[in-house]
């Protein structure tokens, strides 16, 4: 285990010890069915990324599982702009497609479980499209900027947008806490989620050996 609290399962899989505790907490209560649905939605999202990475012969390095996110590390330097963009947005597209399909089934066979599956997929799609560097939306935005501007302009444009998005993210987090009248549980979850995502941005444990 390294200083980041990572357990090395294999050369291609690492998991945060806090993720294990989070999974135990989710499945310990009566909401185990809904926890399984959420994990299935997350798995669908990440599997879509991995599928296209393999399809386009990108060099796959490892998957790191955090309590509030999963990082897929791969060498995409040999991929074209279009293929890399497809790999980046594959997860969000799979969630969007799952949402559309489940909407159809919800109309025919309404159920709370199916409704939750719909909400999970639309939530994952929306959150991952946030234009922060460690989300799919931020990675896609970076690709688009660097493909359309010279290197210097692209660098400063991307940095400016990244900072603006980070400020917006923090403001939204504060709004969530304020909306709950600063409920201690909500505050703890929001702060931990924010720290986890920014830690993911600052450090990539897949490069540590």
Model-derived features: positions:
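Hydrophobic transmembrane alpha-helices and their immediate loop junctions
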Residues: 1-209
């Amino acid at each position: 285990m390294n200083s980041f609290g990572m357990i090395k399962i294999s050369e291609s899989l690492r998991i945060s010890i806090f993720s294990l505790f989070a999974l135990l907490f989710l499945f310990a209560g009566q909401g185990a069915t809904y926890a399984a649905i959420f994990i299935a939605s997350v798995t669908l999202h990440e599997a879509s990324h991995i599928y296209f990475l393999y399809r386009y012969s990108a060099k796959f390095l490892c998957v790191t599982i955090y309590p509030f996110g999963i990082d897929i590390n791969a060498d995409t330097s040999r991929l074209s702009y279009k293929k890399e963009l497809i790999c980046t947005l594959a997860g969000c597209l799979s969630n969007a497609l799952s949402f559309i399909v489940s909407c159809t089934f919800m109309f025919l066979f309404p159920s709370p479980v199916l409704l939750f599956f719909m909400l999970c997929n639309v939530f994952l799609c929306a959150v991952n499209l946030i234009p922060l560097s460690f989300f799919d939306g931020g990675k896609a935005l970076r690709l688009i900027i660097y493909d359309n501007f010279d290197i210097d302009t692209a660098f400063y444009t991307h940095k400016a947008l990244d900072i603006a998005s980070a400020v917006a993210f923090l403001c939204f987090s504060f709004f969530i806490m304020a909306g709950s009248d600063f409920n201690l549980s909500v505050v703890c979850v929001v702060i931990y989620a924010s720290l986890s995502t920014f830690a993911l941005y600052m450090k990539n444990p897949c490069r540590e050996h």
